[in-house]
Protein backbone atom coordinates (compact mmCIF):
# COMPACT_ATOMS: atom_id res chain seq x y z
CA UNK A 1 0.00 0.00 0.00
CA UNK A 2 1.13 3.53 -0.81
CA UNK A 3 0.05 6.76 0.85
CA UNK A 4 -0.48 10.17 -0.72
CA UNK A 5 -1.17 13.34 1.24
CA UNK A 6 -3.71 16.11 0.69
CA UNK A 7 -4.51 19.38 2.40
CA UNK A 8 -7.90 19.79 4.08
CA UNK A 9 -10.63 20.67 3.53
CA UNK A 10 -11.46 18.05 0.91
CA UNK A 11 -15.05 17.13 0.02
CA UNK A 12 -14.53 13.42 -0.68
CA UNK A 13 -18.25 12.75 -0.73
CA UNK A 14 -18.66 15.18 -3.61
CA UNK A 15 -15.59 13.93 -5.50
CA UNK A 16 -16.57 10.26 -5.28
CA UNK A 17 -20.13 11.18 -6.21
CA UNK A 18 -18.89 13.09 -9.26
CA UNK A 19 -16.80 10.12 -10.38
CA UNK A 20 -19.57 7.62 -9.60
CA UNK A 21 -22.03 9.45 -11.84
CA UNK A 22 -19.55 9.16 -14.72
CA UNK A 23 -18.12 5.72 -13.92
CA UNK A 24 -17.54 3.50 -16.95
CA UNK A 25 -18.74 -0.05 -16.32
CA UNK A 26 -15.93 -2.65 -16.36
CA UNK A 27 -13.33 0.15 -16.26
CA UNK A 28 -14.21 1.85 -12.97
CA UNK A 29 -15.85 0.93 -9.67
CA UNK A 30 -16.87 3.76 -7.33
CA UNK A 31 -18.38 3.36 -3.87
CA UNK A 32 -18.98 5.68 -0.92
CA UNK A 33 -15.52 5.01 0.49
CA UNK A 34 -13.24 4.05 -2.41
CA UNK A 35 -12.47 4.33 -6.11
CA UNK A 36 -11.02 1.48 -8.18
CA UNK A 37 -10.22 1.09 -11.86
CA UNK A 38 -8.18 -0.71 -14.45
CA UNK A 39 -5.02 1.08 -15.47
CA UNK A 40 -2.44 0.71 -18.22
CA UNK A 41 1.01 2.30 -18.07
CA UNK A 42 3.03 1.34 -21.13
CA UNK A 43 2.95 -2.43 -21.29
CA UNK A 44 1.95 -2.80 -17.65
CA UNK A 45 -1.66 -3.55 -16.72
CA UNK A 46 -3.56 -3.90 -13.48
CA UNK A 47 -6.05 -2.45 -11.02
CA UNK A 48 -5.55 0.55 -8.74
CA UNK A 49 -7.69 1.25 -5.68
CA UNK A 50 -7.83 4.59 -3.86
CA UNK A 51 -9.22 4.85 -0.31
CA UNK A 52 -9.36 8.27 1.38
CA UNK A 53 -8.50 8.45 5.08
CA UNK A 54 -10.38 11.54 6.19
CA UNK A 55 -8.93 11.62 9.71
CA UNK A 56 -5.30 11.47 8.56
CA UNK A 57 -5.67 13.60 5.41
CA UNK A 58 -4.19 10.82 3.30
CA UNK A 59 -5.18 8.71 0.31
CA UNK A 60 -4.25 5.03 0.49
CA UNK A 61 -3.37 3.52 -2.89
CA UNK A 62 -3.35 -0.21 -3.55
CA UNK A 63 -1.75 -1.46 -6.77
CA UNK A 64 -2.16 -4.94 -8.18
CA UNK A 65 1.09 -6.81 -8.87
CA UNK A 66 1.06 -5.93 -12.56
CA UNK A 67 1.38 -2.21 -11.78
CA UNK A 68 4.10 -2.40 -9.13
CA UNK A 69 6.95 -1.82 -11.64
CA UNK A 70 5.33 1.50 -12.60
CA UNK A 71 4.17 2.52 -9.12
CA UNK A 72 5.49 6.09 -9.42
CA UNK A 73 3.54 6.71 -12.62
CA UNK A 74 0.38 5.22 -11.09
CA UNK A 75 0.65 7.43 -8.01
CA UNK A 76 1.13 10.50 -10.20
CA UNK A 77 -2.00 9.60 -12.16
CA UNK A 78 -4.02 9.22 -8.97
CA UNK A 79 -2.71 12.54 -7.69
CA UNK A 80 -3.87 14.25 -10.89
CA UNK A 81 -7.25 12.52 -10.88
CA UNK A 82 -8.00 13.63 -7.32
CA UNK A 83 -6.24 17.04 -7.53
CA UNK A 84 -4.13 16.24 -4.48
CA UNK A 85 -1.62 19.03 -5.13
CA UNK A 86 -4.27 21.71 -4.67
CA UNK A 87 -3.74 24.17 -1.82
CA UNK A 88 -7.35 24.99 -0.86
CA UNK A 89 -6.35 27.93 1.33
CA UNK A 90 -4.77 29.70 -1.65
CA UNK A 91 -7.59 28.84 -4.05
CA UNK A 92 -10.41 29.73 -1.67
CA UNK A 93 -8.64 32.90 -0.66
CA UNK A 94 -8.63 33.96 -4.30
CA UNK A 95 -12.26 32.97 -4.84
CA UNK A 96 -13.51 34.88 -1.81
CA UNK A 97 -17.25 34.62 -1.22
CA UNK A 98 -17.64 32.14 -4.08
CA UNK A 99 -15.45 29.54 -2.35
CA UNK A 100 -16.99 29.92 1.10
CA UNK A 101 -19.98 27.60 0.70
CA UNK A 102 -18.02 24.57 -0.49
CA UNK A 103 -14.36 25.03 0.48
CA UNK A 104 -13.55 21.34 -0.09
CA UNK A 105 -14.30 21.22 -3.82
CA UNK A 106 -11.42 19.93 -5.96
CA UNK A 107 -10.96 19.80 -9.71
CA UNK A 108 -11.57 16.24 -10.94
CA UNK A 109 -8.78 15.33 -13.33
CA UNK A 110 -8.09 12.12 -15.20
CA UNK A 111 -5.59 9.29 -15.39
CA UNK A 112 -5.01 9.68 -19.14
CA UNK A 113 -5.61 12.64 -21.44
CA UNK A 114 -6.58 10.49 -24.44
CA UNK A 115 -9.19 8.65 -22.38
CA UNK A 116 -10.58 11.97 -21.18
CA UNK A 117 -10.74 13.21 -24.77
CA UNK A 118 -12.78 10.18 -25.78
CA UNK A 119 -15.09 10.68 -22.83
CA UNK A 120 -15.51 14.39 -23.61
CA UNK A 121 -16.51 13.66 -27.22
CA UNK A 122 -18.92 10.92 -26.19
CA UNK A 123 -20.47 13.29 -23.66
CA UNK A 124 -21.64 15.75 -26.30
CA UNK A 125 -25.41 16.37 -26.39
CA UNK A 126 -26.25 13.41 -24.16
CA UNK A 127 -26.85 12.99 -20.43
CA UNK A 128 -24.02 12.12 -18.05
CA UNK A 129 -25.50 8.63 -17.64
CA UNK A 130 -25.78 8.08 -21.40
CA UNK A 131 -22.20 9.25 -21.91
CA UNK A 132 -21.01 6.65 -19.38
CA UNK A 133 -23.01 3.93 -21.15
CA UNK A 134 -21.61 4.87 -24.57
CA UNK A 135 -18.08 4.91 -23.20
CA UNK A 136 -18.62 1.48 -21.63
CA UNK A 137 -19.75 0.12 -25.00
CA UNK A 138 -16.61 1.47 -26.66
CA UNK A 139 -14.48 -0.05 -23.89
CA UNK A 140 -16.20 -3.43 -24.24
CA UNK A 141 -15.57 -3.51 -27.99
CA UNK A 142 -12.03 -2.11 -28.13
CA UNK A 143 -10.58 -2.47 -24.62
CA UNK A 144 -8.36 -5.25 -23.28
CA UNK A 145 -9.72 -7.50 -20.54
CA UNK A 146 -7.35 -8.07 -17.63
CA UNK A 147 -6.36 -11.73 -17.19
CA UNK A 148 -5.89 -11.37 -13.43
CA UNK A 149 -9.09 -9.34 -12.98
CA UNK A 150 -11.53 -10.52 -15.66
CA UNK A 151 -14.23 -8.21 -14.37
CA UNK A 152 -12.09 -5.26 -15.51
CA UNK A 153 -11.27 -3.96 -18.99
CA UNK A 154 -8.46 -1.53 -19.75
CA UNK A 155 -9.62 1.56 -21.59
CA UNK A 156 -8.99 1.30 -25.35
CA UNK A 157 -5.60 2.50 -26.53
CA UNK A 158 -5.18 5.10 -29.29
CA UNK A 159 -3.83 2.29 -31.49
CA UNK A 160 -7.05 0.28 -31.13
CA UNK A 161 -9.38 3.21 -31.73
CA UNK A 162 -7.33 4.58 -34.62
CA UNK A 163 -7.93 1.26 -36.39
CA UNK A 164 -11.65 1.17 -35.54
CA UNK A 165 -14.36 0.94 -38.19
CA UNK A 166 -16.46 4.10 -37.94
CA UNK A 167 -19.58 2.10 -38.80
CA UNK A 168 -18.88 -0.29 -35.92
CA UNK A 169 -18.61 2.69 -33.57
CA UNK A 170 -21.81 4.19 -34.99
CA UNK A 171 -23.58 0.90 -34.27
CA UNK A 172 -22.86 1.45 -30.56
CA UNK A 173 -25.30 4.36 -30.58
CA UNK A 174 -23.45 7.47 -31.71
CA UNK A 175 -23.65 9.63 -34.86
CA UNK A 176 -21.16 8.74 -37.60
CA UNK A 177 -19.45 12.11 -37.27
CA UNK A 178 -18.81 11.43 -33.59
CA UNK A 179 -17.32 8.04 -34.44
CA UNK A 180 -15.05 9.74 -36.97
CA UNK A 181 -14.08 12.33 -34.35
CA UNK A 182 -12.95 9.53 -32.01
CA UNK A 183 -10.80 7.98 -34.73
CA UNK A 184 -9.26 11.37 -35.55
CA UNK A 185 -8.52 11.95 -31.86
CA UNK A 186 -6.82 8.55 -31.64
CA UNK A 187 -4.64 9.36 -34.65
CA UNK A 188 -3.77 12.75 -33.13
CA UNK A 189 -2.67 10.99 -29.94
CA UNK A 190 -0.47 8.64 -31.96
CA UNK A 191 0.99 11.48 -34.04
CA UNK A 192 1.72 13.63 -31.00
CA UNK A 193 -0.62 16.47 -31.98
CA UNK A 194 -2.85 15.85 -28.93
CA UNK A 195 -0.88 17.03 -25.88
CA UNK A 196 -0.93 14.40 -23.14
CA UNK A 197 0.09 16.88 -20.44
CA UNK A 198 -0.77 20.53 -19.92
CA UNK A 199 0.79 22.64 -22.70
CA UNK A 200 2.63 25.88 -22.10
CA UNK A 201 -0.04 27.93 -23.89
CA UNK A 202 -3.40 26.46 -22.89
CA UNK A 203 -5.44 29.04 -24.82
CA UNK A 204 -3.63 28.29 -28.08
CA UNK A 205 -3.82 24.55 -27.48
CA UNK A 206 -7.59 24.82 -26.98
CA UNK A 207 -7.87 26.71 -30.28
CA UNK A 208 -5.89 23.93 -31.96
CA UNK A 209 -8.23 21.33 -30.47
CA UNK A 210 -11.14 23.14 -32.10
CA UNK A 211 -9.63 22.39 -35.52
CA UNK A 212 -10.16 18.67 -34.81
CA UNK A 213 -13.35 17.19 -36.29
CA UNK A 214 -16.17 17.06 -33.78
CA UNK A 215 -14.53 19.30 -31.16
CA UNK A 216 -16.09 22.69 -30.56
CA UNK A 217 -15.29 25.35 -28.01
CA UNK A 218 -17.17 23.76 -25.09
CA UNK A 219 -15.54 20.34 -25.60
CA UNK A 220 -12.08 21.88 -25.98
CA UNK A 221 -12.53 23.85 -22.76
CA UNK A 222 -13.89 20.87 -20.85
CA UNK A 223 -11.02 18.73 -22.09
CA UNK A 224 -8.51 21.35 -20.90
CA UNK A 225 -10.26 21.43 -17.53
CA UNK A 226 -10.13 17.67 -16.94
CA UNK A 227 -7.69 16.23 -19.46
CA UNK A 228 -4.90 18.71 -18.70
CA UNK A 229 -6.13 19.78 -15.25
CA UNK A 230 -5.77 23.38 -16.39
CA UNK A 231 -6.51 25.60 -13.40
CA UNK A 232 -7.63 28.76 -15.22
CA UNK A 233 -10.37 27.70 -17.66
CA UNK A 234 -13.83 29.24 -17.74
CA UNK A 235 -16.89 28.43 -19.88
CA UNK A 236 -18.90 31.65 -20.27
CA UNK A 237 -21.19 30.11 -22.90
CA UNK A 238 -22.01 26.99 -20.87
CA UNK A 239 -25.78 26.59 -20.42
CA UNK A 240 -25.75 26.46 -16.62
CA UNK A 241 -23.21 29.28 -16.33
CA UNK A 242 -25.45 31.51 -18.45
CA UNK A 243 -28.34 30.66 -16.12
CA UNK A 244 -26.25 31.70 -13.12
CA UNK A 245 -25.55 35.09 -14.79
CA UNK A 246 -29.03 36.18 -15.94
CA UNK A 247 -29.10 39.08 -18.35
CA UNK A 248 -25.36 38.92 -19.09
CA UNK A 249 -23.79 38.00 -22.41
CA UNK A 250 -20.95 35.44 -22.57
CA UNK A 251 -18.53 38.33 -23.14
CA UNK A 252 -19.79 40.07 -20.00
CA UNK A 253 -19.57 36.81 -18.04
CA UNK A 254 -16.00 36.31 -19.24
CA UNK A 255 -15.07 39.79 -18.03
CA UNK A 256 -16.75 39.18 -14.67
CA UNK A 257 -14.77 35.95 -14.22
CA UNK A 258 -11.46 37.79 -14.63
CA UNK A 259 -11.58 38.46 -10.86
CA UNK A 260 -10.91 34.76 -10.20
CA UNK A 261 -7.68 34.46 -12.17
CA UNK A 262 -5.60 32.27 -12.08
CA UNK A 263 -8.12 29.84 -10.52
CA UNK A 264 -11.10 30.18 -12.85
CA UNK A 265 -11.46 26.41 -13.22
CA UNK A 266 -12.26 26.20 -9.52
CA UNK A 267 -14.61 29.17 -9.83
CA UNK A 268 -16.43 27.32 -12.60
CA UNK A 269 -16.87 24.25 -10.39
CA UNK A 270 -18.18 26.31 -7.50
CA UNK A 271 -20.71 28.09 -9.71
CA UNK A 272 -21.86 24.79 -11.20
CA UNK A 273 -22.25 23.07 -7.84
CA UNK A 274 -23.36 25.83 -5.46
CA UNK A 275 -27.14 26.02 -5.59
CA UNK A 276 -28.56 29.50 -5.50
CA UNK A 277 -25.26 31.29 -6.12
CA UNK A 278 -25.70 34.74 -7.63
CA UNK A 279 -23.05 37.16 -8.89
CA UNK A 280 -22.36 40.43 -7.15
CA UNK A 281 -23.25 43.56 -9.03
CA UNK A 282 -20.61 43.79 -11.76
Swiss-Prot record:
Induction record: Up-regulated by methylated Ada in response to the exposure to alkylating agents.
Catalysed conversion reaction: Hydrolysis of alkylated DNA, releasing 3-methyladenine, 3-methylguanine, 7-methylguanine and 7-methyladenine
Pfam families per the UniProt record, alphabetical: AlkA_N (PF06029), HhH-GPD (PF00730)
UniProt effect for mutating residue 237 to N: More than 30% catalytic activity, methylmethane sulfonate-resistant
GO molecular function, one term: alkylbase DNA N-glycosylase activity
Catalytic residues in the record: 238 (proton acceptor)
Record keywords, A-Z: DNA damage, DNA repair, Hydrolase
Keyword Amino-acid biosynthesis annotated: no
EC assignment: 3.2.2.21
Claim: DNA damage is one of the keywords in the record: yes
UniProt GO BP: base-excision repair; base-excision repair, AP site formation; DNA alkylation repair; DNA damage response; DNA repair
Record-linked SMART domains: AlkA_N (SM01009), ENDO3c (SM00478)
Annotated site location: Determinant for substrate specificity and/or activity: 218
Coiled coil: none
An annotated GO cellular component: protein-DNA complex
Subunit structure: Monomer.
Family: Belongs to the alkylbase DNA glycosidase AlkA family.
NCBIfam families named among the record's database cross-references: PRK10308.1 (NF007641)
Function: Hydrolysis of the deoxyribose N-glycosidic bond to excise 3-methyladenine, 3-methylguanine, 7-methylguanine, O2-methylthymine, and O2-methylcytosine from the damaged DNA polymer formed by alkylation lesions.
Protein name: DNA-3-methyladenine glycosylase 2
Amino acid sequence: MYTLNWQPPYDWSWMLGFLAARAVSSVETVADSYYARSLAVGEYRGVVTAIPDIARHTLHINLSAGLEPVAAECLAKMSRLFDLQCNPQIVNGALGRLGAARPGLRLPGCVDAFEQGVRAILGQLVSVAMAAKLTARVAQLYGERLDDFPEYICFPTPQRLAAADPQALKALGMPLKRAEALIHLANAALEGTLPMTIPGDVEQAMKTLQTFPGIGRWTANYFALRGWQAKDVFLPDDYLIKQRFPGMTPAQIRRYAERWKPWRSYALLHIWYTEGWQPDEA
